[in-house]
Swiss-Prot record:
F-type ATPases have 2 components, CF(1) - the catalytic core - and CF(0) - the membrane proton channel. CF(1) has five subunits: alpha(3), beta(3), gamma(1), delta(1), epsilon(1). CF(0) has three main subunits: a, b and c. It holds the Pfam family ATP-synt. The lineage of its organism: Bacteria, Pseudomonadati, Pseudomonadota, Gammaproteobacteria, Enterobacterales. It is found in: Cell inner membrane. CDD domains: F1-ATPase_gamma (cd12151). It is a peripheral membrane protein. One of its GO terms (molecular function) is ATP binding. GO terms for biological process: proton motive force-driven plasma membrane ATP synthesis. It comes from Salmonella gallinarum (strain 287/91 / NCTC 13346). This is ATP synthase gamma chain. Produces ATP from ADP in the presence of a proton gradient across the membrane. The gamma chain is believed to be important in regulating ATPase activity and the flow of protons through the CF(0) complex. InterPro entries: ATP_synth_F1_ATPase_gsu, ATP_synth_F1_gsu, ATP_synth_F1_gsu_CS. Keywords: ATP synthesis, Cell inner membrane, Cell membrane, CF(1), Hydrogen ion transport, Ion transport, Membrane, Transport. It comes from the Bacteria.
Length: 287
């Protein structure tokens, strides 16, 4: 019964792993709900900021801010939002594939790329495949704050202000629902004119106090910060949803594997009993 004992050991091992994946699934489900609440709370602010900035981009401003002007593109920057932990399916790798394809498209045009990383998985990936990482922040946990994101954002905005970057993008996963998270690359700077027909029909006329430059300097920076923060909280919700789904799949696969091993064990046990009976009958016949 040496084979049967080995199979029993494998079944026990899979059952223990199944308990772990089930617990991780339940933890991820709880964290996902909290992440969704944070995402829902920050969305109205981010969307309102986007609308206000969209009106500014479509309007005839007294002062043309550098963040609103298109430039000849020689260098582009990416703020890349990844996770700090794994076991979340293909969430990170799908995002990295999309980013690499976009970087290759720019590289084919002779444009250089710089990366600011948010999340340790992105740092590890681009350190291994090669990438010009100029800033990074990791270990933000499950409740990130805007102050933790200021470092990478400040580095990229300073590079844009000094003319070392001509475009700035944010790369993150957009949360659609529990089963669907979409990798997205969104242009932050220069601010793209809104494609929203409603914004084009309803032009707003602004009066600036004290002056357009001071107001736009503050407002446009706040806009970039709000979009980055929204990208981070949506990516966090996507991470927990992907982890919950991955752990559920692992738990279900564990159950299927246990059934298969149980069947193999039963066959091995049956073969052992049959062999013992054959030996007894043969011994009795010999007597």
């Amino acid at each position: 019964m040496a084979g049967a004992k080995e199979i029993r050991s494998k079944i026990a091992s899979v059952q223990n792993t199944q308990k772990i994946t089930k617990a991780m699934e339940m933890v991820a489900a709880s964290k996902m709900r909290k992440s969704q609440d944070r995402m829902a709370a920050s969305r109205p602010y981010a969307e309102t900021m986007r609308k206000v900035i969209g009106h500014l981009a479509n309007g005839n401003l007294e002062y043309k801010h550098p963040y609103l002007e298109e430039r000849d593109v020689k260098r582009v920057g990416y703020l890349v939002v990844s996770t700090d932990r794994g076991l979340c399916g293909g969430l990170n790798i799908n995002l990295f594939k999309k980013l690499l394809a976009d970087m290759k498209a720019w590289s084919d045009k002779g444009v250089q790329c710089e990366l600011a990383m948010i999340g340790s998985k992105g740092v590890s990936f681009f350190n291994s495949v090669g990438g010009n990482v100029v800033s990074q922040v990791t270990g933000m946990g499950d409740n990130p704050s805007l102050s933790e994101l200021i470092g990478p954002v400040k580095v990229m905005l300073q590079a844009y202000d000094e003319g070392r970057l001509d475009k700035l993008y944010i790369v993150s996963n957009k949360f659609i629902n529990t089963m669907s998270q979409v990798p997205t690359i969104t242009q932050l700077l220069p601010l793209p004119a809104s494609e929203d027909d409603d914004l084009k029909r309803k032009a707003w006329d602004y009066l600036y106090e004290p002056d357009p430059k001071a107001l736009l300097d503050t407002l446009l920076r706040r806009y970039v910060e709000s979009q980055v923060y929204q990208g981070v909280v949506e990516n966090l919700a996507s991470e927990q949803a992907a982890r919950m789904v991955a752990m559920k799949a692992a738990t279900d696969n564990g159950g299927s594997l246990i059934k298969e091993l149980q069947l193999v064990y039963n066959k091995a046990r049956q073969a052992s009993i049959t062999q013992e009976l054959t030996e007894i009958v043969s011994g009795a016949a010999a007597v």
